[in-house]
């Protein structure tokens, strides 16, 4: 980040210019078999996402750079993660990290792995005890400066397909 103090002619926009998001766009069109595309969100487009919550619908013009923007698309925010990889959770209505007690759901599988020797070789066994809960860190449902990945799904498509806009064919994205 830009470490100059605000009084040295640096504005909030200069600080935000160094930050980028990775937008993972899930194509919900059944012809594309649910393909996902990674795009970047940076510069002034970044401010369009700050303060948005999981479930909000955003315009696709703010995703991508240059000719590879998703103009005409409507995208729904379905999740994301921060700079440490902590997942966002829709039930938390804040933007910061919180430690909460959870059962098996988003961000926690709810089982223990036990390694045992059986028949001369080591095997992994999953034990899923009833009522297993753990304390895990989650990021709230609001997009902040610490967010590094945003998961989006297509709600309303434009005339041109995502594969055509991004210059990839469906064979390349499936390999």
What is each residue range found by the language model?
Residues 61-71, 81-83:
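Short, charged beta-turn/beta-strand-edge "cap" motif at the junction between a beta-strand
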Residues 7-43, 53, 89-175:
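Low-complexity, rRNA-contacting terminal tracts
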Residues 75-91:
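Short acidic beta-strand-loop surface patches of small beta-rich interaction domains
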Residues 48, 76-77, 154:
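A structural signal for short, hydrophobic beta-strand segments that form beta-sheets
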Residues 26, 59-61, 78, 146:
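Residue-level recognition of conserved beta-strand edge/terminus positions
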Residues 49-52, 69:
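Short, well-ordered loop/turn sites that connect or cap secondary structure elements
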């Amino acid at each position: 980040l830009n470490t100059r103090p605000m009084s040295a002619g640096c504005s909030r926009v200069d600080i935000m210019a160094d930050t980028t998001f990775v937008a993972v766009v899930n194509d919900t069109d059944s012809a594309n078999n649910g393909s996902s595309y990674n795009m970047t969100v940076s510069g002034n487009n970044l401010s369009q996402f700050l303060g948005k919550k999981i479930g909000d619908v955003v315009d696709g013009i703010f995703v991508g750079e240059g000719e590879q923007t998703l103009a005409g698309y409507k995208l729904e925010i379905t999740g994301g993660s921060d700079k440490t990889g902590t997942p966002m959770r829709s039930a938390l209505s804040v933007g910061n990290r919180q430690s909460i007690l959870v059962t098996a759901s988003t961000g926690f599988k709810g089982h223990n792995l036990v390694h045992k020797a059986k028949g001369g070789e080591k095997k992994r066994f999953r034990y899923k005890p009833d009522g297993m809960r753990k304390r895990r860190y989650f990021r709230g449902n609001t997009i902040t400066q610490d967010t590094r990945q945003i998961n989006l799904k297509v709600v309303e498509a434009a005339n041109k397909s995502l594969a055509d806009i991004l210059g990839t064919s469906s064979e390349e994205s499936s390999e």
